[in-house]
Amino acid sequence: MLITNTKQKADGQIESHRKLTERVHAAGGKIAAQIYHAGRETSSAVTGVQPVAPSAVREPSMPETPRELTIPEIHTLVEQFGDCAKRAKAAGFDAVEVHGAHGYLAGAFASPFSNKRSDEYGGTIRNRARFGMEIIRNIKEKCGEDYPVLYRISSVEYVPGGLDIEESKVIARLMEEASADCIHCSQGVYASTHTIIPPSVFPRAGYVEHAAEMKKAVQIPVIAVGRINDVEIAESVLQSKKADLVTMARASLADPELPNKVLKGRGDEVIRCISCLQGCIGENGKGNGIRCLVNPLTGMEDEYDLTPAEKAKQVLVIGGGIAGCEAAISAALKGHKVTLIEKK
């Protein structure tokens, strides 16, 4: 959700988000809103203003140097995070996640890679974590102690002078001290962006050991993430107790029916994410929205009508290439009896 100093604009998001939460709840699901401030991981070309950060240090992958935040501005931002969470609750979200990973503002404060301050928001680990802790406490104050707040952290930033697993474990404990209810264990910053959303050359579930280390540091649940795109691998992570939950984002884009198929014993029918990054990251980066190379319906659901046909027909599809197979699948989903013929 948007963190903004224009209250009217922010309040205007509540109704549109409520439409989403109501549909999720009607299907029996739970939904959390991720709230964040990009900090220095953006540019004036996007926002129209100079980026802000804990220190006036340029992010290596970004074109401009950010402006250092003043103490009063930091206090205002803490309040705005809390206000954003309050709007999320009003919109029907069951929880919020504070994005303190990937070099975004809360994470930038926590990391010595981006925070060079010498006041109460810099220097020691506790000082660097203070911004995130104050955000969590502000949210709890405005939304209630029983309203779940997750905190996302980059366990390892993979940049010189960035967070390592030992410092991140301390930060996770401090967020727990501030009343965070769960730690979402991610990795990387924009300067090491290939680690944030690992491509196919990275091992599956390659960062689970980071989550396992986090579990040793805190008493609250820990979420593992990072190319967990296979049901069996996800289950093995949970059975090993290296994490309490797993994130399967791209896997769910490849097949939104993944949970239902698994629950019905149809795991072998799951459309598997191949970690190609072409449809999800590639197309979204071009401003075309989310797509998926292995599922042509992803992001295009409103443009295709797969409701059952009034009268089932015999359909012959000649050619078993990608297009032919997809045509056969679509026809079958509409209730037709399909024969697929391939020359070879």
Feature roles, as predicted:
Residues 1-318, 322-338:
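Flavin-dependent oxidoreductase catalytic cores
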Residues 340-344:
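Conserved acidic E/D residue at the C-terminus of a beta-strand in Rossmann-like folds
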